[in-house]
């Protein structure tokens, strides 16, 4: 999808260019009507200055709160963005089913933990919960070490 957007809009995909694109053009790039709505909402927030990715709050919970104000972005999406795009070391996506399943396997729990229990189990791993998340994903896809 991203390659198709770059082919249509050029290598510097900008909010302005995306907003100027017609529905059918974006549909041909793989964006459904719903995804286009989310993308347009995001572009409008960036253009208006309501959202500046270079100036997200340093506090992880504040950054998550700001990102989840974007239509179509939930807590999981915000956490994944902060972990991988921003490299924030203490992000723990406790609602991620693979994190829960990996933790279940890693800690030899009787059942997959709930989101609440997943958060509680990782409290002592702060400020390195991002690394723990990556490790639990590994354990989900592979044998535990």
PLM regions: where:
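C-terminal accessory module of base-excision DNA glycosylases/AP lyases that mediates lesion recognition
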Residues: 75-145
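Alpha-helical ds-nucleic-acid-binding substructure associated with the helix-hairpin-helix region
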Residues: 1-69
